[in-house]
Every structure is written in structure tokens, then in C-alpha cells.
């Protein structure tokens, strides 16, 4: 239906925009040219727009001519047309590298695609603007926290996914409280939530990690549980609590 198509198109392009933002900040794009922003501080025009048509995106002669004409026009409308064309060409190039995320689209997917970097109400502006957007450091895998751990790689993508689905998730739970039947399309938004890094570490360290320490203690009974966990750098590992003999027998 109509709503399903709208959601599919919006979610698909939101995913790709976030992925490209992550890739450009970390210099992962094949042509090393920023698509949504500029390496030059304070410059709002994306480097891809500035350097076009002299960019490695397999542009045809006709496409290069279109881009030159749009540039010469200089209007916001033509500038956004050029930006949209270049963005799509970048996605086509990334299809060869990440086909799961940048799939070969149906015609309607690109037909319904609209993007602008000049419109302050557009997702691009809100994403990259230094005053209102998400700090670039949050996307950078080289960003470290106070303890020297990377903070940009996993967390930012996860939280963007989480908050994209927040409205639908809340609405779904509200319907459940009213005993309204939920369609299958709503299930992912309500159940597939982002799990922060520390929770993943806690779960792994106290499951697989505990089994590994038990193995080490079986090999060498003098192995100290707490010391071993500290040696591995396991911050969330909880040593087994001392139990009374009667409890141990039942366990």
C-alpha cells in the first residue's frame, strides 16, 4: 500500500545517507571525496558538488554536460538537482562494494528520491550542520573516550537506527495496551532495538567469558577468576558469588 512504499523509500534512503556520512568522515569512500559535507571547515557546499564533474563516478558525457549546465545556472533548484544526480551516482558506485546496503534500485525508488543540502529542513542539513547536526566526532572511528576506547563506530549507527524507529515503536506499544492487533510490518520496530556496546560486552563476558575462565580453572585450579578477567580487560565480568554448601549441592 501507499504507507508501505513511503516507509520503504524513506528508510532505505535514510540508511544510505547515514552510511555515506559514516564513510566520508572516516575516508572510506572509493574516490575519497566527501558527498554530504566538506573537509574545509565552515564550507557548506559538499566537496562532491565543488569538484563535479571532475569526479570518479563513471559520469557519461551527457551527465557531465547536465552538471555543467546546473552549475552555470547557480539556482538552488538546479544545485539540488546536481547534488541529487551525484548522490545517486555515488550510490551506484557503492553497489559494487556494499550490494546489501546499496542495492540496485527499482525505478520508483530513485523516482521518489528527493534530497537537498541547501534546504535547512532537509535531513542532510540537519545531519552535517555544525551548529544543529550530529558532531562529526561521533562518526569518527578514531574518536576515543576517556579510557581510550573507540566511541564512534558502533554507537552512532545503532542510535540512529533506534531513534528512527522510536515513533513507530511507541505507537505500536500504545496499540498493544489497547489490545489492537499489530501487523507484521510493525514487529521489527518494536522488537529489534539497538543494544549498546556495554550491554553486549556484559552479556559476552558473563556467558562465553565465564565458560572460558571455567576451562582455564579446570586446567589450572590455581587460576584466580577475578585476576584473569582483569588480565583480559573484562570490565563487566562478575565473579561467581560464594554460595553455601547446601546451595552448591542443589546447583
What are these regions (language model features)?
Residues 1-251:
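Preference for the N-terminal adenyl/adenosyl cofactor-binding alpha/beta module
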